[in-house]
C-alpha cells in the first residue's frame, strides 16, 4: 500500500515527441496544441478499440454511475515495464514496427500534482479493455491505495496463464481528460547515458532525468 502523496503515474512515448511535450505538455488527442507530427509506438488495433470503447464507471459496485468513452482520455500506468511495453519493443499484435528501448522515454508525474489540475479523471483496477475491470471516479480517489493491487502492479513476473490475474491487475490505469502542462512533469526515464545526453540537449535538466535500463525489456 502507498501513501497517495507518493504515487507516481507513468506514460511512455517516442523520443521524437519529447520536444513538443516540453513546449506544450502532454496533450489530448483533441487539443488545439496536439502534436500534428506525433510518432506513435503503440498497438494500432488497441488504439482503435479504445477510441470508441464505452466503459461504465461503477466505483466497484454493480450499478453504473456514468458512462465514458475510453478514447477521450490520456492513459497512464502506475509503474514501469508493462506488458504493452514488451509488445512495443518486440513487436506482435498490431505493432507494425518494434521500437528500440533507446527510443522510448517514460514521462513521470506525481498523482497529487495531476489532481491539482481539477480535470475530469478516472482510474481502473486492471486492464482498461477487460470486461471485468472496474472504473472509479474522483469520489474514490482517497481509497486508491486499497483499490489497486500494488503487489501485482509492481510485479516483474506476469507471463503465462498462471499469472493472468497479475497481468490484468498490473495494467491498472489512471485516465485524465485534458492537457497536462510541462511544469507538472516530475522527471523522465531513459535507457542509457547516450539518450540522457539527447534529453539534456532538448533542454531537460540533468536532475530531471533518470537512467534505468531495468524499466525496459
PLM features: residue spans?
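Active-site-proximal loop/hinge segments that shape catalytic or ion-binding/gating pockets
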Residues: 1-217
Amino acid at each position: 500500500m502507498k501513501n497517495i502523496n507518493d504515487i507516481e503515474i507513468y506514460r511512455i512515448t517516442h523520443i521524437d515527441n519529447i520536444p513538443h511535450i516540453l513546449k506544450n505538455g502532454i496533450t489530448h488527442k483533441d487539443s488545439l496544441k496536439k502534436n500534428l507530427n506525433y510518432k506513435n509506438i503503440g498497438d494500432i488495433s488497441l488504439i482503435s478499440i479504445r477510441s470508441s470503447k464505452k466503459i461504465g464507471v461503477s466505483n466497484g459496485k454493480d450499478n453504473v454511475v456514468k458512462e465514458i468513452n475510453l478514447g477521450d482520455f490520456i492513459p497512464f500506468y502506475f509503474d514501469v515495464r508493462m506488458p504493452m511495453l514488451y509488445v512495443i519493443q518486440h513487436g506482435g499484435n498490431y505493432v507494425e514496427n518494434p521500437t528500440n528501448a533507446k527510443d522510448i522515454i517514460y514521462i513521470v508525474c506525481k498523482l497529487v500534482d495531476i489532481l491539482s489540475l481539477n480535470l475530469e479523471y478516472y482510474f481502473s483496477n486492471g486492464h482498461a479493455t477487460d470486461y471485468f475491470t472496474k472504473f472509479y471516479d474522483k469520489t474514490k480517489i482517497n481509497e486508491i491505495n486499497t483499490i489497486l493491487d500494488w503487489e501485482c502492479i509492481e510485479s516483474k513476473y506476469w507471463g503465462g496463464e498462471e499469472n493472468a490475474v497479475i497481468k490484468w491487475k498490473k495494467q491498472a490505469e489512471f485516465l485524465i481528460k485534458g492537457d497536462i502542462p510541462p511544469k507538472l512533469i516530475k522527471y523522465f526515464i531513459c535507457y542509457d547515458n547516450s539518450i540522457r545526453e539527447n534529453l539534456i540537449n532538448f533542454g531537460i535538466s540533468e536532475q530531471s532525468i533518470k537512467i534505468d535500463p531495468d524499466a525496459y525489456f
